[in-house]
Swiss-Prot record:
It catalyses: oxaloacetate + phosphate = phosphoenolpyruvate + hydrogencarbonate. One of its GO terms (cellular component) is cytosol. It is an enzyme of class 4 (lyase). The active site is at residues 138, 546. GO terms for biological process: carbon fixation; oxaloacetate metabolic process; tricarboxylic acid cycle. The keyword Lyase applies. It comes from Pectobacterium atrosepticum (strain SCRI 1043 / ATCC BAA-672) (Erwinia carotovora subsp. atroseptica). Its EC number is 4.1.1.31. The gene is ppc. This is Phosphoenolpyruvate carboxylase.
Length: 879
């Protein structure tokens, strides 16, 4: 690991030097000297030199308005380069060794060594493996796409420089290219000027597929095949592709009025168009590769009979023309042209799969397996993973929108006001209508705009090719009628297939009631018949943590999952738990392996379905090599969790967690909800108000424009606290709960839980990571610069609580310093802190100056946005 780190540090240093050269050329020696001085002071300040810390503050406070932007940009760009070097040096964003086949082989080794498992058990588990990653356009991806492309190329250059046999002139060429890329980045605006539309976000998602996943998924499956063959002498069946991708971009309308039925329809077409484009490129390659003439009689017939000289090519050429026709038809539809579909329009995956698979079988039969297992196998696997839709779409909408639509319908029909009915009356009405053969909607009725939008969305789903919509997610689901309402609206729209409808339980109360709601639903005969033994439930991480604090929320999530697993098992229902976690700790983010192994036993039987958000998509899937690593991690963790599940926690551990949860929730809510100074303090001490100006995602930052903390979305809430380094949502309440349990004489029990219960040890590990990124002196500096004096005592109270929390966590984990068991994460945070600290100080300074201004100052605002983007890069998991 040390060797790896010294290699990374030398690359970071080289990239820093090149950035320095660029700055010097662009702005002259003076600015570069200033940046260098600040960097050295920051390094010394980090090492504990108080005099240099004061000097650092003075230097940054004394920068003129003209100097603020270049200095902020220098540190922000340096952090992007550091992250790129770190990603290259096989240390992935969470300190998990990336791109390392050993991950899979060590997982297989552990499985083989287990006395209770037969090879058949392992094989069955591999073949039923299901990983569905749901890409969401969260506004935490701060880096512009144009800069991401340049950073990917920087990564490629680092790879080339690692070759020992490079000739001098080749090394010089690579260095010249690096200089060009760094100069291009420096002269590019890093801040978007215009907020992206939902269609822009969807295109960003397709770019991730095209630039990384298209190569990365088949490469991962080849890796998996090799490891399986080495361990068990067996390869995956051709049609077994354990990885799928779904997207919320263009489908998630919860609180986002910009995502309309028309946008969803457009994104579905765009997705099919991109898939046809990518498959056409694959087929072009196969046309040139598959020049063989020997084939089976079945294939010859498929190719057109005995006259055909090159049967494989003939089939590929026919596919090529089918894809070309599909592409031009979809292009016409996207530009609004009404055109009759061609007779061989590609609509289903089978249309692609059958001819390709026939070629594969023929090559295998004729002794050309080595050819079959090349590009052709990769394409077959892409058909199974991406298929004709490329990525499937989830539609998400808030439960009250469905209630309002049905209330409008029942009022119009003279049946009363659905919204005011009791839950049992709602259920009786919904089941009656679901069982009825006549339509509910009157023919010539004109609904209100909001209701029309809900109904139009259901019609888009009904008309979409089967397989292009993955699920309908209901946010803020609280009752069985919330689920039945969506089923009825889909029936009324003429939906010809049973779409999975997933209630999302996301506040503390909703999580605690989740099992009751699902038990009631599963007791309804109509519902049981309709779902045919399968149910998806989504667990919300971010809103529950914002509602109750991270410790109470994570325990409620665990208990809800555990209860749902047991209820569905008893009812004979296959449950898929869908995890809505973010990149940050306050939104459920954790190193993948630890997070999966810390879930209740049996939670991954129905496969893994999890959201991948914002900047985490780039860190985990931005490069094919890193994609291989991330998928290998998930695969190993799921197989272990299913085949070697963690033991059921002891009853007394449950009791400790109940107490911990109660104390931590009370403390968290005592500050966030009940302290009248809290919201004014939050608004002053963080850039929360300024964050609204960042053109990040297409979603508004608030559910209600004039509400308090509760109306803030979870992402800006966490993003704001990450910026001022107090990281409050990720720890507040947790330490107080732990302290109470220790005071009750149960420290030994906590230590035992830490050693023997993955759920608990992961919670403690996540707290340590947050504490390593939090910073008391910086949080205090924000208070001094930005908060009125009467609120200072609250800031001091919170910082004292943070210091106490750090001590109690160290006592329970028996360590002298944080992250003792994960030195590479500690190293990585330390490396970035030197560059993040000046950005934090600058940000506080800029907030101070911009809040003094009578008129907005465009230059100050731009510099502020750069510091926000830079701190986000330094903290890595922003929201």
């Amino acid at each position: 690991m040390n060797e790896q780190y010294s290699a990374m540090r030398s690359n970071v240093s080289m990239l820093g030097t090149l950035l320095g050269d660029t700055i010097k050329e662009a702005l002259g020696e003076n600015i570069l000297d200033k940046v260098e001085t600040i960097r050295k002071l920051s390094k010394s300040s980090r090492a504990g030199n108080e005099k240099h810390r004061q000097e650092l503050l003075t230097t940054l406070q004394n920068l003129s308005n003209d100097e603020l932007l270049p200095v902020a940009r220098a540190f922000s760009q340096f952090l992007n380069l550091t992250n790129t070097a770190e990603q290259y040096h096989t240390i992935s964003p969470h300190g998990e060794a990336a791109s390392n086949p050993a991950q899979l082989s060590s997982a297989f080794k552990r499985l083989k060594e287990s006395k209770d498992l037969s090879e058949r058990d392992i094989r069955d588990a591999v073949e039923s493996l299901s990983i569905e990653l749901v890409l969401t356009a969260h506004p935490t991806e701060i880096t512009r796409r144009t800069l991401i492309h340049k950073l990917v190329e920087v990564n490629t250059c680092l790879k080339q420089l690692d070759h020992n046999d490079l000739a001098d002139y080749e090394r010089n060429q690579v260095m010249r290219r690096l200089r060009q890329l760094i100069a291009q980045s420096w002269h590019t605006d890093e801040i978007r000027k215009i907020r992206p539309t939902p269609v822009d976000e969807a295109k960003w998602g397709f770019a991730v597929v095209e630039n990384s996943l298209w190569e990365g998924v088949p490469a991962f499956l080849r890796e998996l095949d090799e490891q399986l063959e080495q361990a068990f002498g067996y390869r995956l069946p051709v049609d077994a592709v354990p990885v799928r991708f779904t997207s919320w971009m263009g489908g998630d309308r919860d609180g986002n009025p910009n995502v309309t039925a028309e946008v969803t329809r457009h994104v579905l077409l765009l997705s099919r168009w991109k898939a046809a484009d990518l498959f056409l490129r694959d087929i072009q390659v196969l046309v040139s590769e598959l020049s063989m003439s020997e084939c089976t009689p079945e294939l010859l017939e498929l190719a057109g009979g005995s006259e055909v000289q090159e049967p494989y090519r003939a089939i590929m050429k026919s596919l090529r023309s089918q894809l070309s026709c599909t592409l031009s038809y979809l292009e016409a539809r996207l530009t609004g042209e009404e055109r009759l579909p061609p007779k061989d329009l590609l609509i289903t995956n089978e249309q692609l799969w059958e001819p390709l698979h026939a070629c594969y079988q023929s090559l295998k039969t004729c002794g050309m397996g080595i050819i079959a297992d090349g590009s052709l196998l990769d394409t077959l696997r892409r058909v199974r993973c991406f298929g004709v839709p490329l990525v499937r779409i989830d539609v998400r909408q808030e439960s009250t929108r469905h209630t309002d639509a049905l209330a409008e319908i029942t009022r119009y029909l003279g049946l009363g006001d659905y919204e005011s009915w009791s839950e049992s009356d709602k259920q009786a009405f919904l089941i009656r209508e679901l069982s009825s053969k006549r339509p509910l909607l009157p023919r010539y009725w004109e609904p209100s705009a909001d209701t029309k939008e809900v109904l139009d969305t259901c019609r888009v789903i009904a008309k979409a090719p089967q397989g292009s919509i993955a699920a309908y997610v209901i946010s803020m689901a609280r009752t069985p009628s919330d689920v039945l309402a969506v089923q009825l609206l889909l029936k009324e729209a003429g939906c010809p297939f049973a779409l999975p409808v997933a209630p999302l339980f996301e506040t503390l109360d909703d999580l605690n009631n989740a099992d009751d709601v699902m038990t009631q639903l599963l007791s309804i005969d109509w519902y049981r018949g309709f779902i045919q033994g399968k149910q998806m439930v989504m667990i919300g991480y971010s809103d529950s943590a914002k509602d109750a604090g991270v410790m109470a929320a994570s325990w409620a999530q665990y208990r809800a999952q555990d209860a749902l697993i047991k209820t569905c098992e008893k009812a004979g229902i296959a449950l898929t738990l869908f995890h809505g976690r973010g990149g940050s700790i306050g939104r459920g983010g954790a190193p993948a392996h630890a997070a999966l192994l810390s879930q209740p036993p049996g939670s991954l039987k129905g496969g893994l379905r999890v959201t991948e958000q914002g900047e985490m998509i780039r860190f985990k899937y931005g490069l094919p090599d890193v994609t291989i690593s991330s998928l290998a991690l998930y695969t190993g963790a799921i197989l272990e969790a299913n085949l070697l599940p963690p033991p059921e926690p002891k009853q007394e551990w449950h009791e400790v967690m109940d107490e911990l949860s109660r104390v931590s929730c009370d403390m968290y809510r005592g500050y966030v909800r009940e302290n009248p100074d809290f919201v004014p303090y939050f608004r002053a001490a963080t850039p929360e108000l300024e964050l609204g100006k960042l053109p990040l995602g297409s979603r508004p930052a608030k559910r209600r424009p004039n509400g308090g903390v509760e109306s803030l979305r979870a992402i800006p809430w966490i993003f704001a606290w990450t910026q001022n380094r107090l990281m409050l949502p990720a720890w507040l309440g947790a330490g107080a709960g732990l302290q109470k349990v220790v005071d009750d004489g149960k420290q030994e029990q906590l230590e035992e839980m830490c050693r023997n219960w993955p759920f608990f040890s992961t919670r403690i590990g996540m707290l340590e990571m947050v504490f390593a990124k939090a910073d008391l002196w910086l949080a205090e500096y924000y208070d001094q610069r930005l908060v009125e004096e009467k609120l200072w005592p609250l800031g001091k109270q919170l910082r004292d609580q943070l210091a106490a929390d750090i001590n109690i966590v160290l006592a329970i984990s028996n360590d002298d310093h944080l992250m003792a068991d994960l030195p590479w994460i500690a190293e990585s945070i330390a490396l970035r802190n030197v560059y993040t600290d000046p950005l934090n100080v600058l940000q506080a300074e800029l907030l101070h100056r911009s809040r003094q201004q009578k008129q907005p100052d465009a230059d100050l605002e731009l510099a502020l946005m750069v510091t926000i983007a830079g701190v986000a890069a330094g903290m890595r998991n922003t929201g």
